[in-house]
Each structure stands twice: as C-alpha cells, then as structure tokens.
Amino acid sequence: MKIKVGLIGFGRMGQMYWEEMQKSGRWDIAYICDTDPASRELARNLSPSSRIISDEQEIFDDQSVEAVGLFALANSRKEQIEKAVRSHKHILTEKPIADTIDKEWEIVDLIEKYDRIAAVNLYLRNSWYHQACLLY
C-alpha cells in the first residue's frame, strides 16, 4: 500500500523529493502545493496524476492524506508543522525546521510529544566525520 502524501514547496528541494518518491514506488503523491505559478505549471507537467494547488490548507484538511512533505521556505515551516500536528499527519521536513532558534525549540517541544513520525532531512555531507570518510 502506498503512502498518500502532499508536498508543500516545489522548488529545487521539493522537486528532488518528488523525484525520489516517484522512484521508490512507495508514495502516492496526491497533492503538490506551491505559491509560484511557474512551479505549479512545472508540477502539472511532471506529475499529472497529482492535484496541483496554491493553498496548502487543502492538504491539511484532506483526512486521506497521511503525510506531508514540507519543502517551502523556513519562515513557513513552524506554522506548517503545527498544522500537520493538528491534522494528525506524518511529517517530512527540510531543514531548518523554523526561521529562528526559539521557534525551532518550540517545534522540538511539540514534536517530542507527537504520536506520528516527524523527520527532518538533515544532510550529513558537511559533517567532519562524513568528510573524513570521503578521504578513505
């Protein structure tokens, strides 16, 4: 059974996630949301089976959507994560999870009590130990 997901943000990172989700075959990408008309047009061309929207609230309101992918700008993520929690969705978000450290800690506090999966895509390619591994 595929996981029904709505993607919010279809810029570079949203497109990369969309591509990997397509490859895996485990995802039903029901919605792609972006405020930019050019990004929505690209999404229509790349993902004709997805519903292309400009209002993210449709994703949160759709009870059949199990997960959200948050790939828009960091200044929108705290509110989006809060909406996802209120609507009982699993969360896959790009980093950072908010645009200030205080907001990030508020999200951490919220997510620690959450009964769904909440994952932050935190690339490790810049960490010292990853760089050391690449030398060998």
Please place each PLM-identified region on the residue numbering.
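A contiguous active-site-proximal alpha/beta segment in oxidoreductase catalytic domains
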Residues: 98-136
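Short beta->alpha connector loops
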Residues: 11-13, 73-75, 124-126
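Beta-loop-alpha module in the N-terminal Rossmann-like domain of NAD(P)-dependent dehydrogenases
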Residues: 17, 50-110
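Short, Asp-centered acidic motifs that coordinate Mg2+ and/or phosphate
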Residues: 31, 66-67, 117
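N-terminal Rossmann-like dinucleotide-binding module
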Residues: 1-47
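Short helix-capping segments at alpha-helix termini
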Residues: 24-26, 87, 112-116
